[in-house]
Each structure stands twice: as C-alpha cells, then as structure tokens.
Amino acid sequence: MLKQVEIFTDGSCLGNPGPGGYGAILRYRGREKTFSAGYTRTTNNRMELMAAIVALEALKEHCEVILSTDSQYVRQGITQWIHSWKKRGWKTADKKPVKNVDLWQRLDAALGQHQIKWEWVKGHAGHPENERCDELARAAAMNPTLEDTGYQVEV
C-alpha cells in the first residue's frame, strides 16, 4: 500500500518579475516538513512551480499524494495543458515555446512516480496550510539568496 502524503504549496514574488520565494509543507502521518527558498529575480509562476517540485522531489518512494495549490497556472498546466505541450515538443497551440519549460519538465519528472490528486484552494482565504506556505514564501522572497538560472526576461 502506498504511503499517503499531503503537500501544500505557495509561491510569492515582490514585483513580477522581482525577488521571489516558495513555501511548501509536506505532511505524512501527522509529521510535517517545511521547505522554502528565495530567489533574487524570478516570477510568481516560477515560484508556484518550484514549491510543488521541491516537495515532490523530497519524497523518497512512490506515494499517494494530495497536492493543494492556490495557483490555477500550476493546476491547469499539469491537469490540462502539459499533455498537449509534450505532444507538440513543448510548444503552445500557437507554436510558441512553453514559458517556464525547465520547471514544467522538472515537475513532470517529479510526478511520474506518484499517484497525485490536485486540489485548488483559494489563496488568502484563511486556509491554514496555504497561509503558512504564503508566510514561508514571502519571508524567503524578502531574503533571497539564490539565483533563478532558468528565469528568462521576456522581450
């Protein structure tokens, strides 16, 4: 039987682009582990993706995961858009490169070994774990120490 794990995520950006951070909580059998990091220049969508990626990559074996995010971008990307992007060689319907492709590919790889149920929660609406992730993400964004090497300035 697969271990049942809950993951809660959030990303934050002070300016978009600007300094950003992510926060994630991984819960298994009542125990929690938190993750957060801040980047000097990034976007909110990249930080939303990073939160999910880092938490999933921390899992050491196949798990049944309920992943809660307040990001429609992440939820729709993974449940609706990614299959078409992959078929088209990571291009959008209008044949443009998928934005944040480095992180989408990393998330896709992290998902491969787990059974995932995606849940959307309304941000800033009092959901306790989402609020905690938001606090982690904002604190990391206010004290960025990393460079987001995959971030590309849009022309």
Curated annotation (Swiss-Prot):
Subcellular location, record wording: Cytoplasm
Binding site for Mg(2+) 2: 10, 134
Claim: Hydrolase is one of the keywords in the record: yes
UniProt-listed PROSITE patterns: RNASE_H_1
Any one GO MF annotation of this record: nucleic acid binding
Details of cofactor binding: Binds 1 Mg(2+) ion per subunit. May bind a second metal ion at a regulatory site, or after substrate binding.
UniProt keyword list: Cytoplasm, Endonuclease, Hydrolase, Magnesium, Metal-binding, Nuclease
GO cellular component, one term: cytoplasm
Function, in words: Endonuclease that specifically degrades the RNA of RNA-DNA hybrids.
Subunit and interaction comment: Monomer.
Name of the protein: Ribonuclease H
Annotated source species: Escherichia coli (strain 55989 / EAEC)
Gene: rnhA
